[in-house]
Amino acid sequence: MSNEFTHINADGNAHMVDVTEKAVTEREARAEAYIEMAADTLEMIMSGSHHKGDVFATARIAGIQAAKKTSDLIPLCHPLMLTKVEVELEAQPEFNRVRITSLCKLSGKTGVEMEALTAASVAALTIYDMCKAVQKDMVISQTRLLEKRGGKSGHFKV
């Protein structure tokens, strides 16, 4: 693990990292998030009886869109040409929650960790938004990077 913040320059100011001289490599990142809810709320999602429509389909599209917009949301992120974004949603009724996983890929000069984290986070927020009329105390938690490949820092896996 590095002991330097790459987004802080010598004067202590935030700046966008210069990746001009970095090599183009295959990069991939996976992230996850969970949203916990009442059993009745989860059943409504699973059965497709939610009055707003298919919650999982909407959350999946929102996560994909969010990955593509990460540089608009996080000030020092580079705009990236993503080659793949995948968002999966898994109902876990035994825990009254939904597990969201994301995968982002590209060939580029900088990693896709923030895009994967943003995809999982926004998918969870979309579930909250669609279900808040029936339950306001849902909890989004455990958002984390699961794995990253490529680039100078190499492979990371939890």
Curated annotation (Swiss-Prot):
GO aspect biological process, one term: Mo-molybdopterin cofactor biosynthetic process
Domain of life where this protein originates: Bacteria
Keyword Lyase: yes
Recorded catalytic activity of this chain's protein: (8S)-3',8-cyclo-7,8-dihydroguanosine 5'-triphosphate = cyclic pyranopterin phosphate + diphosphate
Entries under InterPro entries matching the protein: MoaC, MoaC_bact/euk, MoaC_sf, MoCo_biosynth_MoaA/MoaC, Mopterin_CF_biosynth-C_dom
GO molecular function per UniProt: cyclic pyranopterin monophosphate synthase activity; GTP 3',8'-cyclase activity
Record keywords: Lyase, Molybdenum cofactor biosynthesis
Active site positions: D129
Pathway it works in: Cofactor biosynthesis; molybdopterin biosynthesis
Gene3D superfamilies: Molybdopterin cofactor biosynthesis C (MoaC) domain
Disulphide-bonded residues: none
Pfam name, any one: MoaC
Enzyme Commission number: 4.6.1.17
Residues where substrate binds: L76, C77, H78, M114, E115
Family (UniProt): Belongs to the MoaC family.
Alphabetical list of NCBIfam families matching this protein: moaC (TIGR00581), PRK09364.1 (NF006870)
Subunit note: Homohexamer; trimer of dimers.
Chain's role: Catalyzes the conversion of (8S)-3',8-cyclo-7,8-dihydroguanosine 5'-triphosphate to cyclic pyranopterin monophosphate (cPMP).
Name this polypeptide is given: Cyclic pyranopterin monophosphate synthase
